[in-house]
Amino acid sequence: PALVRSLKLQKRAARVGFDWPNILQVLEKIEEETKELVEAKELESQEKINEEFGDLVFSIVNLGRHLGVDSEEALKQTNRKFINRFKFVEDTIRSQGGKIENTTLEEMETLWQKAKNS
């Protein structure tokens, strides 16, 4: 998987000293990459958007490495959490006789927060 490859590349670079010395600098890099992604979106260049999105994900994996987080496992956990919460939203709407496609974003967000807090 690409997340695992990113981590390996970063570890290899870090072994020879090509690494940010602290978390603050990693966060600054993430902020920089986020701004570049927004700029690419404004240009409406899908190629540039893809490039900047990849740079942002790579930087986030680097943050995970600095924090001792396994990015692959963290994302798997987040996927499971999303599945459970979204299922709660769907099930709640159905139990109230509604259809999710007729539910407003605001109503779904309210249910999402309820799922998140339970």
What are the language-model segments listed below?
Residues 1-53, 57-118:
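Flexible "arm" and connector segments at domain edges
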